[in-house]
């Protein structure tokens, strides 16, 4: 298992945005939907961060986000 920023798809490599003021469990629910233990909205990046993701779950790599893929 790993702790990391989930991405929508591995090809796009875009982190999942979240509202830092009104999270309402959005990231936690998203992460649990990806079979992680939990998740939260990391305020400095305004992106979801997951704890305990399966090793094969797509996460942010060093490349740029490519929303047009």
UniProtKB/Swiss-Prot annotation:
Domain LCN-type CS-alpha/beta, by residue range, is 2-66
Keyword check for GTP-binding, yes or no. no
Disulfide-linked positions: 14-65, 18-41, 27-48, 31-50
Q: What superkingdom heads the lineage? A: Eukaryota
What is the annotated role of this protein in its UniProt record?
Inhibits voltage-gated sodium channels (Nav).
Family to which this protein belongs: Belongs to the long (4 C-C) scorpion toxin superfamily. Sodium channel inhibitor family.
* Name of this chain's protein: Sodium channel toxin
**From which organism does this entry originate?**
Tityus metuendus
